């Protein structure tokens, strides 16, 4: 309905009408000087924002590829460097196990790429003894950041968007397309990036090629990386370190003489006994080496690491003439290797270890006796698997991990910029993804110092030893997804409706193989010398009557440790779990005029799993997730926000397989973990920038942990059945999050344009921890996953035309709260004992970083950064947490904590080229 505009004739109107002819005449007189100006069109690519999916944006962070470049993100640890409340979970062997958010980590924080879940952190039981706390890798595959267009980090329950795993938050990556490389108005694009990071001697080389011919287009990205371990502050590794090593010395006993028959040229005992040899015994000798070469629990430096990565991404496609329809494909292959040596394992035997093993083994024939002048050949003791190991060789423990990801898929995208049909946007995609983690443990005892990973026992190296153990874990997904978006108005209310559907066939497979040992022995016998003139000789080891022995070449013995069906770590029966899942989600973000925005979402998930192993806790799970949010806008400069959301995590494949204690376990019913998030915030915004402060409350229940069902018998609590993964814990946390960016020119226009400041703060407090009464032998939930409270303050300048810029960042972290590391364990007898996650916690620390960039002719950008500018000595909690009980591969028997020191002053450089 059109409104009628009434025209009222008055003195003012008459005056204007009278003046108009004269004005028109003047314009006509000057028309000869008029020029038609060209039409200027300004186009900008749509950037992902915090409020794209959820109206409040509370708890969300969005980073574009440009942001990643500016922050010099070269690996997973750089991604959240300046984002308090989000931390990387160290896997313990150079890799990572995802992120920790709001007290939860690993599989409780969802990780997806284009909606496809990445591999779970699968921790298998470890072999008894040794240094390992997990038999498998426990890592989560890392993402190639040069392939990333944008990343959205959500803190708080987020299953309505990301499904299972988003119990405490989610990290969602979006892959680049050809448009991200091809410049506006061009038909092709080339991007190259060369970067070096001093903290780990990391080198990155990436090149992206994209082109468009007619409707056809394609993108190709290749990235290679090579790096070492993250080096600690130089002060942590200064000096030298000493250790004891067992060396051979002559036995002082009067009855320790012998003759080797093979060394007696004429074979006559009587002739050769005039020059007998003396037995050897072990004695500790103090030796000194550099801190880099030292092995043992008191090692100052981190374990050496060799890291390599190769990634290919290929995205071909065809865009139809009207540009509404697009059909494309994606092929991705990424392989990363993490090869490390555990140098906390002493390379050399000591007298204490030698004597203890020898005592345990009893009498060892030939001990102390050697051939030739090779005195070390007489020092050997009992080792693993009944093998004898010599003091001559050093021990090396190596972990070689290879992470391989392969993905290919098809997609159809419909985009309607005119918004005049049933959908503004629709996407139908099919992805087939396989991710495998190959974890190979090797223990060598066949080289001089233990550093040779490739040495093997041989007949000419008696008492040498080798052990291999390999666990290969893989997951596969065949995922079909559909997404629809539509904006429309009803009664002056703007709706932004989206519908998401998905169906997945998945599989999990763990193979335990190459589990064997090899050892080299020697031929030895103690003989009776031939009679002398018919007289029997009985040697007693004295100088005049030495022993008469034979020492010959031995052989190599190989023994298999793998067993089938014994339900312990040595069981090498393949583990397989398969299943299907589907989901349906709907979300509507509504704009109620200029005063308020309201949003709500609902999602239904279904998962069914099965296995050939009857002990696996498979089954069917149905879950419903939702969220709701509101933004009140009383003024142009103030927003009041509030949101609630739920999250869930279905039992992981490792939890479904269960804990095997040598008996045939029974399958148990495991319910999904659940979470409920409440969050309220206030946002100040304007020409000055924006500042947001929020308070959150996260409650977790039915947390899954290993333990027993409890029962009361004769008035006492006792365990029922076998150990299993059970729903047993609940917890609640609260916290504060502050985020802001200030444009100083907007605050005061006298200041130059381009100056800005940033501020971020996060604090979490544990409010409640409970254990179910019908569970026992349960460890209370320890919040070692909480990052200590942290402030990040920045001051920067970007030249208005984007030619150059500089930025300084101050990061201050508080100490790790001791209360977050203390807990109790419910014992089988009904009592409990106090526990502690780890023996150490970190102190407060601060660092200053400075970075900048300079662009030459719009094609070349040089970036540089100085991190820990003041060369401050500090230790992060994320590093020390590797010694905590909740660590994936817990570091045990740590003597000194220098090895966890953060890098000192270090530099990063990169050169970007765009054409």
From Swiss-Prot:
GO terms for biological process: siderophore transmembrane transport. It comes from the Bacteria. GO terms for cellular component: cell outer membrane. Its main location: membrane. The keyword Cell inner membrane does not apply. Gene3D superfamilies: TonB-dependent receptor, beta-barrel domain, TonB-dependent receptor, plug domain. Residues 121-139 are annotated as: Plug loop, interacts with transferrin. A motif (TonB box) lies at residues 38-45. Residues 187-915 form the TBDR beta-barrel domain. CDD domains: ligand_gated_channel (cd01347). Residues 523-542 are annotated as: Disordered. Present in outer membrane vesicle formulations which are used as vaccines in human. N.meningitidis cells will only bind to human TF, not bovine or porcine TF, explaining at least in part the bacteria's inability to cause infection in non-human hosts. Neisseria acquires iron by extracting it from serum transferrin (TF) in its human host. Acts as a TF receptor and is required for TF utilization. Binds both apo- and holo-TF, via the TF C-terminus. This is Transferrin-binding protein A. It comes from Neisseria meningitidis serogroup B (strain ATCC BAA-335 / MC58).
């Amino acid at each position: 309905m059109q409104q009628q505009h009434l025209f009222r004739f008055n003195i003012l109107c008459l005056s204007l009408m009278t003046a108009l002819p004269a004005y028109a005449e003047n314009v006509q007189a000057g028309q000869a000087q008029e020029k038609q100006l060209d039409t200027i069109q300004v186009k900008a690519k749509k950037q992902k924002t915090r409020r794209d999916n959820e109206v409040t944006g509370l708890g969300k962070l969005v980073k574009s590829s440009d942001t990643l470049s500016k922050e010099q993100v070269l690996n997973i640890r750089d991604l959240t460097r300046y984002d308090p409340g989000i931390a990387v979970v160290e896997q313990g062997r150079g890799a990572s196990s995802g992120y920790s958010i709001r007290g939860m980590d690993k599989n409780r924080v969802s990780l997806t790429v284009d909606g496809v879940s990445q591999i779970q952190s699968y921790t298998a039981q470890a072999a008894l003894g040794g240094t390992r706390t997990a038999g498998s890798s426990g890592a989560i595959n890392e993402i190639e950041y040069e392939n990333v267009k944008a990343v959205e980090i959500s803190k708080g329950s987020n299953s309505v968007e990301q499904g299972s795993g988003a119990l405490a938050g989610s990290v969602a990556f979006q892959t680049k397309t050809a448009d991200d490389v091809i410049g506006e108005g061009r038909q092709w694009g080339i991007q190259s990036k060369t970067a070096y990071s001093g903290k780990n001697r990391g080198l990155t080389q990436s090149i992206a090629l994209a082109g468009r011919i007619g409707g056809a287009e394609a993108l190709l990205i290749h990235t290679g990386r090579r790096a070492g371990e993250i080096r600690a502050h130089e002060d942590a590794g200064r000096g030298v370190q000493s250790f004891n090593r067992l060396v051979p010395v002559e036995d002082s006993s009067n009855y320790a003489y012998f003759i080797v028959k093979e060394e007696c040229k004429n074979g006559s005992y009587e002739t050769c006994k005039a020059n007998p040899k003396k037995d050897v015994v072990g004695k500790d000798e103090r030796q000194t080496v550099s801190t880099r070469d030292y092995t043992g629990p008191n090692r100052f430096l981190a374990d050496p690491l060799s890291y390599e990565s190769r990634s290919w991404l290929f995205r071909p496609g065809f865009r139809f003439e009207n540009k509404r329809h697009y059909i494309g494909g994606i092929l991705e292959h990424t392989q990363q290797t993490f090869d490390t040596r555990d140098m906390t394992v002493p390379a050399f035997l000591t007298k204490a270890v030698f004597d203890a093993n020898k005592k345990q083994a009893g009498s060892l024939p030939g001990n102390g006796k050697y051939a030739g002048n090779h005195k070390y050949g007489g020092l050997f003791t009992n080792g693993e698997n009944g093998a004898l190991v010599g003091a001559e060789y050093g021990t090396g423990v190596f972990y070689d991990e290879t992470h391989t990801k392969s993905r290919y898929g098809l997609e159809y995208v419909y985009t309607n910029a005119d918004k005049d049909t049933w959908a503004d946007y629709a996407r139908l995609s099919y992805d087939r993804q396989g991710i495998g983690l190959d974890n190979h443990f090797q223990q060598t005892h066949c080289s001089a110092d233990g550093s040779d990973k490739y040495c093997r026992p041989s007949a000419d190296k008696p008492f040498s030893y080798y052990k291999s153990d390999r666990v290969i874990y893989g997951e596969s997904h065949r995922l079909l997804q559909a997404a629809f978006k539509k904006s429309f108005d009803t009664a002056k209310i703007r709706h932004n409706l989206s519908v998401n559907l998905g169906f997945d066939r998945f599989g999990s497979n763990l193979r335990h193989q190459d589990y064997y040992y090899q050892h080299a022995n020697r031929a030895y016998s103690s003989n009776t010398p031939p009679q002398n003139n018919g007289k029997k000789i009985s040697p007693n080891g004295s100088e005049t009557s030495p022993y008469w022995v034979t020492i010959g070449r031995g052989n190599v013995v190989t023994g298999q440790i793998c067993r089938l069906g014994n339900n312990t770590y040595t069981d090498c029966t393949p583990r397989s779990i398969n299943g299907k899942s589907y989901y349906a989600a709907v979300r509507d973000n509504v704009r109620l005029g200029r005063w308020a925005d309201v949003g709500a979402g609902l999602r239904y998930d279904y998962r069914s799993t099965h296995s050939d192993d009857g002990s696996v806790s498979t089954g069917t799970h149905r879950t419903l997730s939702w969220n709701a949010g509101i933004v009140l806008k009383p003024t142009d400069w103030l927003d009041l926000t509030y949101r609630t959301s739920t999250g869930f995590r279905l039992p992981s494949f490792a939890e479904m397989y269960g804990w095997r204690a040598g008996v045939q376990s029974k399958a148990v019913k495991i319910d999904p973990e659940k979470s409920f998030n409440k969050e309220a915030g206030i946002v100040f915004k304007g020409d000055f920038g924006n500042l947001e402060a929020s308070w959150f409350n996260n409650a977790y229940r039915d947390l899954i942990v290993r333990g027993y069902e409890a029962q009361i018998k004769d008035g006492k609590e006792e365990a029922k059945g076998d150990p299993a993964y059970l729903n047993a814990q609940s917890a609640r946390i609260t916290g504060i999050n502050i985020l802001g960016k200030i444009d100083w020119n907007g605050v005061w226009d006298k200041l130059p344009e381009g100056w800005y400041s940033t501020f971020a703060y996060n604090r979490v407090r544990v409010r409640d921890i409970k254990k179910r009464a019908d569970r026992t032998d349960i460890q209370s939930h320890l919040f070692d996953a909480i990052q200590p409270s942290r402030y990040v303050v920045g001051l920067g300048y970007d030249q208005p035309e984007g030619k150059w810029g500089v930025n300084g960042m101050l990061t201050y972290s508080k100490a790790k709260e001791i209360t977050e590391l203390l807990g109790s364990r419910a014992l089988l007898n009904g009592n409990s004992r106090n526990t502690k996650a780890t023996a150490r916690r970190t102190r407060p620390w601060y660092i200053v970083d400075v970075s900048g960039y300079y662009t030459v002719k719009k094609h070349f950008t040089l970036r540089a950064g100085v991190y820990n500018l003041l060369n401050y000595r500090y230790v992060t909690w994320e590093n020390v947490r590797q010694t905590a009980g909740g660590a994936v591969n817990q570091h045990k028997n740590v003597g000194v904590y220098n090895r966890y020191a953060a890098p000192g002053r270090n530099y990063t450089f990169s050169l970007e080229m765009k054409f």
